[in-house]
């Protein structure tokens, strides 16, 4: 019996632009997050600038086209990781076109790249950042930024997740927080350390009791944006003498300290909201050889924060921080 080729035959082709619009429609039907849709759109524009004419039939794209795109990006002196980020979009798009029968089958491989090791925050830097602000002179903004840094380190959450938190998402009696907005549209309940529960209890004393209000707001009570959050962390870190200002670096630091404390990679995967163990394995490969026998808790904030803090609570003016 002759083996059948089960690959779809190449169909009458749409243009490149039409195919991409159908691809994005497919992604919306899959209920991809807006962040993912924006990612595909941005990387698509980069690929289309290289192609020049997106009104030509999609079947004109070949394996050689992709190879030329790689050379084009290399000529622009893009980093290997950036090239691979662009290629992942191209691969997802063109593989979908192959499944639809718009293209002949061919393989798209990423370029070899050394994974850059992002240096996490050091213990000295964390001690500076986690030092409680002067309760007599501190503004709401500085206090809020201190709470934000504690929250990022204490949960390992993404900045986008933090921005979408509502006051009602905290259940401090149970010691948990509900993450309603995550990268892959997942939602999950994450435990909070004792140190972070105490910090959040005090922070909520200066906030409104409305459970639907944003957890972290501007000095005027407005919803923070990703840009304003980034600026807040940038200013706060520099005010503490720390040059590193990446919000995502708190996530890497959380993972590093968790692994070094002997934490279970499978549990770390769940805590960080990763769809699989790929990223968690990278953390283990980077940090597992650095285990410290004297760590007595898995949560990094618990290791670095004194639970019994002293000093007067911050005095807020009427309506400030509400």
Language-model regions: role of each:
Residues 1-322:
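Conserved catalytic core of the tyrosine transesterase superfamily
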């Amino acid at each position: 019996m002759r083996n059948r080729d089960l690959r779809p035959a190449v169909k009458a082709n749409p243009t490149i632009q039409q195919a991409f619009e159908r691809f994005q429609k497919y992604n919306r039907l899959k209920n991809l997050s807006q962040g993912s849709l924006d990612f595909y759109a941005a990387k698509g524009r980069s690929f289309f600038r290289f192609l020049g004419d997106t009104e030509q039939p999609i079947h004109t794209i070949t394996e050689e086209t992709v190879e030329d795109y790689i050379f084009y990006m290399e000529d622009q002196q893009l980093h290997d990781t950036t090239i691979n980020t662009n290629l992942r979009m191209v691969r997802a798009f063109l593989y979908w076109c192959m499944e639809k029968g718009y293209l002949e089958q061919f393989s798209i491989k990423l370029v070899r790249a050394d994974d850059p090791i992002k240096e996490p925050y050091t213990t000295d830097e964390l001690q500076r950042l986690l030092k409680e602000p002067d309760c007599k002179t501190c503004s709401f903004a500085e206090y809020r930024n201190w709470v934000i840094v504690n929250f990022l380190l204490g949960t390992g959450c993404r900045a986008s997740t933090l921005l979408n938190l509502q006051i009602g998402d905290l259940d401090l009696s149970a010691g948990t927080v509900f993450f309603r907005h995550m990268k892959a549209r997942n939602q999950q309940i994450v435990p909070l350390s004792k140190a972070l529960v105490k910090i959040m209890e005090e922070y909520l004393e200066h906030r409104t009791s409305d459970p639907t209000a944003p957890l972290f707001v501007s000095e005027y009570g407005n919803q923070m944006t990703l840009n304003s959050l980034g600026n807040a962390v940038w200013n706060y870190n520099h005010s503490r003498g720390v040059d590193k200002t990446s919000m995502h670096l708190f996530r890497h630091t959380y993972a590093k300290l968790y692994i070094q404390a002997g934490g279970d990679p499978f549990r770390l995967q769940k805590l960080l909201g990763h769809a699989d163990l790929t990223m968690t394995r990278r953390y283990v490969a980077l940090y597992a050889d650095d285990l410290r026998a004297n760590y007595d808790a898995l949560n990094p904030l618990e290791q670095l924060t004194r639970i019994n803090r002293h000093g007067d609570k911050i005095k807020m003016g009427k309506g400030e921080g509400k």
